[in-house]
Regions:
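Single conserved hydrophobic/aromatic residue that forms the stacking wall/gate
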Residues: 214-223
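Metal-dependent de-N-acetylase/amidase catalytic core
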Residues: 1-14, 97-215
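Generic secondary-structure boundary/loop-capping signal
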Residues: 85, 90, 182-184, 188, ...
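Generic hydrophobic alpha-helical membrane-span motif
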Residues: 25-28, 140, 222
């Protein structure tokens, strides 16, 4: 929607992802640009990230703690307003009514103009990102939370008891690839910040992976 047609300029965004580092792999430069331009950007993570390790000495509780710390450091680099950890167990996420309610609560609390989230459909051409069940569940629950749950007063009326009035999100952006995309963000000048944010996830990302990403990511990023 053109700025001239909006009741108020867009200035608040919410990014809803399954795991710590999902946003950094998909839309970190967009988040960095928004923050630099004065937007309030909140990141909501659905899972605790407690399964992403091949270290036989690592425990789920310890990994969850490490990844939460890494995400907070990344958020500082990007300039995010807040990070919300919903804390669902990693790798077991399903688009339940409870997850939808928990996401809708944050939508009502932070009242974003734009929500950025994951695609709810499986991409069989993607070996990792597009086929992870937590990503699919997050996309489905986030879309349902935006519409109709966060919008409708009589859905989960207990949220009203928490002082959270309904909220209508202006736009939803789905991260993805070139095919079928209809919205592009020029992130020229923000890739270095995005790479530094990705490097904060030391338990998940090797320096070689960050270097490779730096060389191959385009400067116009799809959101």
């Amino acid at each position: 929607m053109p700025d001239s047609e909006r009741e108020e300029p867009y200035s608040r965004a919410m990014v809803i992802m399954a795991h710590a580092d999902d946003a950094e792999w998909t839309c970190a430069a967009t988040m960095a640009k928004m923050c630099a331009e004065g937007w309030e950007v909140v990141l909501v993570l659905c899972t605790d990230g407690s399964k992403g390790s091949d270290d036989p000495e690592m425990t789920a509780d310890r990994l969850a703690e490490i990844r939460a710390g890494e995400q907070q450091e990344s958020a500082r680099i990007l300039g995010l307003k807040d990070v919300v950890f919903l804390g669902y167990p990693d790798s077991y996420l399903e688009p339940t009514l409870q997850l939808r309610k928990d996401i809708a609560r944050e939508v009502r609390r932070h009242r974003p103009h734009v929500v950025i989230t994951e695609p709810p459909t499986r991409d069989i051409d993607s070996r990792y990102y597009g086929s992870h069940p937590d990503h699919l569940a997050t996309g489905e629950a986030a879309l349902a939370a935006v519409f109709p749950t966060a919008r409708d007063r009589l859905t989960f009326p207990e949220l009203l008891d928490e002082g959270l009035e309904p909220h209508k999100v202006g736009e939803v952006w789905i991260v993805g690839g070139l095919e079928g995309s209809d919205h592009f963000i020029d992130v020229d000048g923000y890739m270095e910040t995005a790479m530094e944010a990705l490097k904060a996830h030391r338990s998940q990302v090797s320096p070689e992976a960050v270097s490779y990403t730096h060389l191959t990511l385009p400067t116009k990023r799809i959101v």
